[in-house]
Amino acid sequence: MFTASKLKVMQLRSYDLFLDLDFQNLQFRGRVLIELESERDVTLNSIGLRILNSRSDGKTLDFEQSGEDLLIKTGPFKGTVEVEYAGSIPDLLVGIYRAPYDGTYMVTTQFEAAHARRMLPCVDHPDYKAEFKLTLKIDKDLDAISNMPIESVEVEDDKKVVSFQKTLRMSTYLLYLGIGRFEEAKERLGDIEVIFATSTGKAGKGQFALEAAKRSLEFYQSYFGISYMLPKVHLITVPEFAAGAMENWGAITFREAALEVDENSGFKTRRRVAEVVAHELAHQWFGNLVTMKWWNDLWLNESFATFMGYKVVDTAYPEWSVWQEFLITEASGAMARDSLKNTHPIEVDIKSPDEIEQIFDEISYGKGACILRMIEAY
């Protein structure tokens, strides 16, 4: 498994990804063209994928797989590497996976921290950003969501080819793909389309989340002095989801309970939904547009979004007095976690992706947010 120091020999420009997805049998075949420059043989990350071939300019390239590394024998290289491969869609809740509900399922992705390699061979490292061009071949009765709006749809018998607009330069962990049958509710904030996407029959539960998202976007655009960079943002409910939410750029995913509000939902539910929406939208600037070089700085990524989420909700809903909740939830939670023998500093020296999952906790989120609030008030 390679680390940041070994990756400095490579520069990435773009991924052009095509996936032919068998929704019924939960299989897919992929082809990715990666434009890059490398001082030596190209090393990519890949796990659970069956590599069929690799080539460049029509010439077959030898390759070796070892653990999660895919070594393509290019020598010093500048150009486009093409890799064809096949994979399956498990129930792992990371990478590309199946999320069941009501006798059916959706296919969704969760790539943070280092799971994009489960859907495509890539340099799965936050500092190695690239543009992504995604094209899918799926059943024609299915819907598809990704980071960018759909560019074109071409029907081929019982299938359709869906092409999405090219993304901005971004890290692999922010790429998103969702396939299934979605129902949507939409609002607009200027040129930005804000979309609540959920399983059929639940679109009415997204109105409060849409309102909270619009208020958050207005706040951040003013606070940062930088407009939201994409033409749309999806808020997507996922029925089986290990995280509370995930800030995929332009296609944010949530647990259903973290996003849905109806007439029976109380004040605490609405407050929690507003906080989570504001947190994930903060990442669209801090984390997505501006990104840490390595996971040592996860605390700043997450604590800043936590801190900003409270600022937004306090501005949008001042009657809720959320800074009192901050003391109860974030400060007290961090102190309790910090009292344990296995606590850790807010900045942790991460040697490999295997260690990253261990620090998504009250220290990285809550303690870091408390320190940022202290700094602001200093």
Where are each of the predicted segments found?
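Acidic/His-enriched low-complexity segments
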Residues: 1-232, 257, 360-362
